[in-house]
Structure formats: structure tokens, C-alpha cells
Amino acid sequence: MKIMGVAKRHAIKLLRRAVGLPTGDLDIVGRLDGFENDVVHGWAHWPRQKGRRVIVDIFAGDVFVCERAADMLRDDLAANGIGDGRHGFDVKIPPAFSRGAKTRIRVRPVTDAPLELTASDERALFARRISRDDYLRATFAEAFDSERERAAPAAPQPSQKTELLFAPTPVSSPPPVLGEALCAYLDQNRYKWDLADKFDATLSIADREAFLAHYVEFYGRARRPLRIPLSARDIEFLNEGPTPQERLAPSRAMRLFAQTPGEDARDDERLAAIFRWAAFGAAAFNVEDCLIASAHEDALRHCDDADIPFPLSTFMKRFLDAHPMLRGANVARESERRAAYFAILLFAARAPHYLRFVPADWLAAYLSPRAGAAPFEDESRRLFGAGGVTIARWRAAIDALGYDDEAKRFRTRTPSGHRAHSAALPAPAGETVDIQLIGPFSRQLGIADSCRALAAALQQLDYSVRLCDFTLDYPNRIRADAVPLPTSPARAKINILHLNLEELPSAIAYLPDIWSQGRLVGFPYLEMPTPHPAQMLGLALVDELWSASDFTTQALAGHRPCHTVGTSARPARRRGRGAARARVYEDIAGADDFVFLASCDALSGAFRKNPLGTIRAFLAAFPNDAKVKLVIKTHSVDRVRAERETNVWRSIRNIVAECERVLLIDRILDDDEQMALIEGADCYVSLHRAEGFGYHMLEAMALETPVIATAYSGNMGFCDEQTAFLIPYRLIPVGPGEYPRTRGDQLWAEPDFTAAVDAMRAVFGDRDLRERKVAAARVIAETQFSTEAFARRLDARIEDILSRRR
């Protein structure tokens, strides 16, 4: 970690002082480390001012985004002797300001000379001095955009679905010991992210604290700028600490997430810590809307000199003093106090919770015209000229951030006191359609293909249909041919959430609350014969379930009404085996080679998809035949993180390196290439241990490619002895690390090795048998799994639902 040399910095400082130029920027060291996934990372430090944190202003282009204290602990800073290591910052750039990777990020430490952090730590030889007014003009000149900050329509009242997120968890467990049971959403989060063995909030208060600390710090920061769900009890628990006798005692949230003074600290030290948390710390954790204790709000709102016009509260005074460009004002003068109000209201346009610390009556007076313009508008014209910030545009800015200025609170709080992001979202505009389909349309994964198949079938029917792209928690790559779709739904008579059950609660938590007037249908895939605790809340939230296979229906029927509606294969454009092979196999297989193909998304699980088992069977079936090859098609191996999974892929790469008849394709193919890959193979192999449905097997049947498949799970809706070479199996326990959120009682199939070897040899050697199965399979694919057949099944179920509304 290289920073500008002390000698060079000192020489520049002496030169500037000699000619009367500012030197404040030379007292700061720091760097902009990078900008990735809309998060800006960096650090800034004042070596000569121990314990003081640098304040940084973050810009996207020329637009001010927010102000933060550089106070995040970074181990690399501590290891390199950079102060106490608490000098980092990371800020999520909200979508309203972001242009993705094209966003030009600027980070300016607040000092009396212009300074912008870069990848180096160099300083200019000369610098101009800036005044308070210059600073405010430069910071807020482009901050108010009428389009970006248009006032939002009122949010609807939270529905019963939203309230269910905060109900008792549907997962049965022993009664609490000394701790408390988590609400449904937080408990589901614990199971979803494989934290159940690490955290049990029911055991003790300390255990409850530990989970909530992890939830807010890691899950909450990852979700920024979305507001993660917190129950009213969670909020009360985290705000506990201050009492009528000790109103300045730190809250539990402060103790968990911030630096707090010791028990023998003076009141001024405690108040300073409360101010730092309220001004910067809570916002850094995205909890400023709910985790500032009410006793602390009262203390920060207090005015020592309440009898004078436009008095400054404790918060306002400390904010001015903490801010290098605002401190030093002569607040004994009313004009300076009015200017201070204006400065703080400008910052409140990016941090609306500041308004809770401004005296309410005087804030109203500042925004109200008396014998002319309001004081706000007077100060705006003085600072920005005739085209300055209007009160209407300022109100629109705070409204866009979900703050209700009349109620003096954020709209994220429900009438029950819970915190829900959906509660702050505006009521959706547009007509009520018959059917709304919500799912990860734009992603490169199986359920996205299923979304498109479902959409195609629905659009054949005589109903109004709206499609909505929902990709939260789907890290898969974006399809190159993805069609832009709305990401925010509106109202519908039937809402279909085509998501995995463990992802479904996130749709309720983070989408507008549109669920109260329509029927909510979940359309999940299930790979295990019983649902996992992470999937139980998803089941509780829906009114009914649709499934593509009887396997899923049987697994879920005891939890919600479940209807098998099936699905459809993508329309097959047959080009002939020779042309298909030339399209994608040109460099790896000749025209007269016999090619077995197995495929899987590496993020779908190497143990579940079992490519290594396929390789074992292939090499046992054909140990030496140079004209028989196996192609393993995958993608995203570089994104696999689980150790046991990476070990499997490392072993596969080793085999590929040592055996020229086993080939690996690790890249995303477009739909045309994928179809050619399947059609150009002589046999498609799926020795899976569990399968939600098995689209590639069905597509192989439609393309007249023989199929070898494990006789278990979702594919059995179209695989039988007439259509496929079925491999018998035995049920075995799912091993640790072999499947997400593995439980000891979960079972899946272990395909019979000898049968798999025999099936490969049969496909290769018995042409008549191969062709009989291919012909039968094609009939099934075209008659039962066409878009038209799928549409007919859907129509029957939809008509039944809508007829009950009439």
C-alpha cells in the first residue's frame, strides 16, 4: 500500500503556506480502491488528528449521492499501520444515480482545498481555497433532478402477505431457552444462507444479538439500497439501551455496529458517539430509518437556546462542528443560523433522517413563506441564483427516498411497527391484468427458460398478461438475447411467482405490495422429495402451487393445494445431425465419431448433476474406442466457490487433460448453439441424482437425440421405458456439502453404475432399439409438451380461478 512520501508532502505544504494557499488536503491520505457491482470502495485518514474521521462526499458524475464518515474497519489498513484501521468506506450507488460500469465515481474528502481520491495518493502543487458557499454550490449544483426525484404516489397499506413475513416462523423448533424465536423472514434467512448451525437465537440474548448483527451487517449491506425486513420486536430489541435514568446509554445497535465509549464515559463523550451513529453510522448500515433510539433522537433534537429565532439543535451544532466546510459559523447571528438550516436541509435531501433532529416548528417556519418568500427560498437564491433549489424539488427529493415529512418518519415502517421495504414503494400504476408472471426472465438458467415457456403458453390464451423480470438472488449471467421487461409489477387478478420457494419471500419483501386483491400462485421446482426449512415460508405465502411435474406435486401437496400443469419444450428447429455437428462440434468431434453429451450449469451443483459419474460410466463402457467421445457442457465453473464442488471440477479438468476422448465446454451458448449441441450428439446422458424437471432431456427428445436418464424425480413425467434408456437407482442420504442447505434426512438417487455402462453400450450398439425409443420420445415431446398443449392445461386452471371471482 503506497502513499505519497512524507518529505514530498511536507515540501508542497511549505510552498503553499508561503504563497497563502490552503493545505488541508495535504493532511489527508487515502485512495479510491475501486467501483464494482455499484459499490464504491476506498479509504481516507487524517494521520495528525488521532481519532478523527475524514468525511467524504460521494458523487456519481457531477451528482452528489451521499456523505459518509470514513470509519469502517479494514484489516489491510490496520496491517499496514494506517491509523487504527477504521478509515474505510464502501457506498452502494442507488439505481437512480448509477449507469453500471459506466458510472464515473468521484470521492471528495471534505477539506478547505479541492481534493479527489484516486488510485494514487498524489497531490497538486497548487490548490485554490474554497469557501463554505463555494463548497455547497459545487456539491449540490446538480443534486436536484426533477425526473429522478419526482414525488412518488402513496404506498398501499401492507397486505396480509407482507405481515406474514413477521409472523412466527413456520418451521417447528423447541421452545426458546433464554433467547427469542425469530420472525418468519429472519428464520427463513437463517436457513436459506446455511446459518442454522451457526446461529440459534432461541438459546440466549447473546445468540440473538449475534444473529441480528450478522443479518444487518452482511445481509443488510449486501441488499443496499433495499431495506431488509425487521420485525417490530427486532427493532425494539436493537434500540434497547437508553433508559429514563440513562438516556445517553448506547443502544444495542450502537454496541453491535459502532464504536462506543466505556461505562465511565462523560455525557459529552456519549453524546458524541450518539451523534456519529445518527449522522453517519446508521446510514452506512442502511438502518437510519429504524435503528436510532427514540431517547437519542430526543437528545439530538434538544435546543439549549430555544427562545431565539431558528435555534440550532444539539445535532445541528455537532454536524456543523464535525464538518470541515461548515464549522466556524457565527451562530449568534440569525443570518448564520438560517444559512446553517439551509446547509443541513440540503444534506437532508440525501439523508432525510436528519430532519428528525431539526426543531419541528422552526423547520416548518423555514419552509413557509412570510410576507414574501420562505427563508429556504431566500437562501437558495442567495447561494444558487434565480434558478436555485425550490421547496417543491427539495420535498420531492426526500419523498423519493421514502421519507414522509408530515409524519416525520420513513414509510418503511408498517402500521404494526415492522420494517418492510415494500411498505415504502408506491402503489403500482396501470390497469389490472388477468395474469401477471414474475420470474428471472433475463437470466441464463433453467427456471428462466421455464419462465419463457410459461409466458409463451399464457400469451396464446385469451387473457391480458403482464411479464415482470425479477432477478434478486439469481447471480447467473444475463442472457445475450434478454428482452427488456418491467422490473416492477402492477396489479393482477392472478400473480404467478415462477421462483424457487426459497427465493419467493424476497419477492414479497422487496416488490410493491400488489398481493391483496389477486390470487398468488407459486410455480417452483423442487429437486428433493421433501421441502427444506428454507422453503417453508415460501409455501406459507402462496395461495396455491403449480408444478411442472408430479414429483413436485407429490412433494408439496401436503402444504398447499398443488396442481400439475406441466410445461413445454422450446420449439425445436431441426437442421439434421450432420449440420448440427458442424455448427458446434467442428473442433472436437468428427462426422463419424459417436458423441455422448452431458450438460449442466456449474452453479446448479456438480453432485446433483453428477458429471463425474457420467465420466466414470463412459470410460468403463468405452475404455479404448477412439471414435467414441463424451462432451461435458457446462458454464460458470469459475464462479463456483464451495470447496467440494470446486474439487469435482478440478478432477474433471484433470481427466480432460489426460484423456482426449473426454472433452469439456465451459462457456455459455446461445439458444441456437445449445439446440445444435443437443441435436449434434448421438446420445444425451443425465445420470442425475435429483432433477427439478430436466429440460435438456425433453429438448433432446424433441430433436430426436436418444436419452439415457436416471429413473428418478422430475424427468419421470416424460421418461419411461418406451422413451428413454432408464437407469435404476437406490436412494442414499445427501452428503454434507453436496447440496445447498443439506439436512441429514434428505435422500436422492444414486444411479446404478453397471446399468449406466450397459445403457451406453446399448445406445452405441443397438440402432433399432435406439430408433424405437427416439420415435416414441418425439411423439411425447410434440403432443404433451408443446406450447399448445401447455396452454390448454393452463387455461383450465386459470378459468377455474377466475370463475370464482365473478
PLM feature segments, named:
Residues 107, 324-326, 330-331, 415-427, ...:
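Extended catalytic core of nucleotide-activated donor transferases of GT-like folds
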Residues 682, 704-706, 711:
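A short alpha->beta transition loop at the rim of the catalytic pocket in nucleotide-sugar-dependent
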Residues 3-226, 237-246, 256, 260, ...:
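Basic, ligand-binding patches in group-transfer machinery
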Residues 755-762, 769-783:
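A short, well-ordered alpha-helix in the C-terminal region of glycosyltransferases
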Residues 449-457, 465, 573-674, 679-680:
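Conserved catalytic-core segment of nucleotide-activated headgroup transferases in glycan assembly
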